Amino acid sequence: MSGYSNGGGYGGISSFALIVVLFILLIIVGTAFVGGF
């Protein structure tokens, strides 16, 4: 795990934060789409 975070251009925290942000945006868009109808 540590070798992967240190070897790539992305850090372990930044890649995890990016996934979390995309997941949150997906939830927001999904709730807005369902709420629209």
UniProtKB/Swiss-Prot annotation:
Keywords: Membrane, Transmembrane, Transmembrane helix. It is a single-pass membrane protein. Signal peptide: none annotated. The chain crosses the membrane at residues 16-36. It is found in: Membrane. InterPro entries: YjcZ-like (IPR010070). It holds the Pfam family YjcZ_2. GO terms for cellular component: membrane. Belongs to the SscA family. This is Uncharacterized membrane protein YczN. It comes from Bacillus subtilis (strain 168). The lineage of its organism: Bacteria, Bacillati, Bacillota, Bacilli, Bacillales.
